[in-house]
């Protein structure tokens, strides 16, 4: 069905399904002399599941005995999952927060600590829907 209209080159579907694929066709239009829209063809479609956008401005700063992570809020996120690893360690879950920052008090002073931050929200069924991460950051505890 109809999703929305915009004069811009992007559109955010706030009602996208998170448990199934959403299909989108974009139709260009011009206004006719009579004031009616003349709709063009849509040569292709795209599809995706509804998730939160990646966090932006992810940064790591060394602190005494810790590494402090900060980022800009992801639209519609209820919280953030923090994953990481040291140079020689295994990738895994570190913690979660509803804020736009996290302090890893178990960060290594000897090795680089690598961090990924994933935004999430809970759908109507209470299921956690996890978004993507755009990049990673790294730091060492002082």
Residue spans for each PLM region:
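Beta-strand-rich modules
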Residues: 13-35, 104-127, 131
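Conserved strand-loop elements at the edges of beta-sheets that form or border functional pockets
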Residues: 5, 15, 62, 96, ...
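Short strand-edge motifs at loop-to-beta-strand transitions and within beta-strands
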Residues: 9-11, 100-103
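Short beta-strand segments within Ig-like beta-sandwich modules, predominantly Fibronectin type-III
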Residues: 2-7, 93-99
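Pro/Thr/Ser/Gly-rich low-complexity, intrinsically disordered linker/stalk tracts
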Residues: 18, 34-76, 109, 124-142
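Extracellular low-complexity, O-glycosylation-prone stalks/linkers
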Residues: 1, 25, 74-93, 116
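Low-complexity/repetitive intrinsically disordered segments
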Residues: 1-17
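Beta-strand residues in well-ordered beta-sheet regions across diverse protein folds
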Residues: 14, 70-72, 83, 105
């Amino acid at each position: 069905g109809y999703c929305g209209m915009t004069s811009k080159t992007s559109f955010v579907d706030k009602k996208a399904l998170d448990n199934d694929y959403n299909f989108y066709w974009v139709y260009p239009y011009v206004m006719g002399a009579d004031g009616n829209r003349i709709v063009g063809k849509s040569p292709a479609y795209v599809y995706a599941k509804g998730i939160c956008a990646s966090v932006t401005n992810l940064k790591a700063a060394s602190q005494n005995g810790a590494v402090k992570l900060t980022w800009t809020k992801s639209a519609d996120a209820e919280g953030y999952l923090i994953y990481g690893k040291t140079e020689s360690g295994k990738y895994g879950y570190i913690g979660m927060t509803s804020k736009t920052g996290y302090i890893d008090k178990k960060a290594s002073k000897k090795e680089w600590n690598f961090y990924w931050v994933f935004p999430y929200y809970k759908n109507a069924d209470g299921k956690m829907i996890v978004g993507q991460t755009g990049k990673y950051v790294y730091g060492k505890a002082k």
